[in-house]
Amino acid sequence: ACNKKDCWVSGIMIDLNGFKQINDNYGHAEGDLALCIVADLLRKSFSEYGVVTRYAGDEFVIMLNTTDDQLIQKIIKSAKKNFVTENEKNDKPYQLSASMGYAITNLSNETIDDFMNRIDEQMYQDKMKYYEHNDRRKSK
């Protein structure tokens, strides 16, 4: 919420894990289908809480309508569960998953560029945790 002194915002940066391997192993048409599935999952997971946008390639940004840290963590956890559910029900030879990073800021104290860099860094930290436990070369 913004007023003359403060402008609090929150956002989530999302990047698909292993998307290049989907394109390389199964073709760009399958990669495009995977992006559509992910976009639908993200809309279902986040539309109640903000606006989902495709940022670049396999990256998405959600600008949230809440700055409640616990709620943001809860909806990220729920979104990751939605990916697991999607993988269980589809018959794809690969797993869909995403790394997610978020931040809450007062734009009176931080530029939007710095904010975007911060959520990108948080997403990168999540991606490092993902790849510590998942070998990039494995598929379903």
Report the location of each language-model feature.
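Catalytic-core segments of nucleotide cyclases and related cyclic-nucleotide turnover enzymes
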Residues: 73-77, 84, 88-91, 105-134, ...
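Conserved long alpha-helical elements within nucleotide-processing catalytic cores of c-di-GMP signaling
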Residues: 3-10, 17-47, 53-57, 61-62, ...
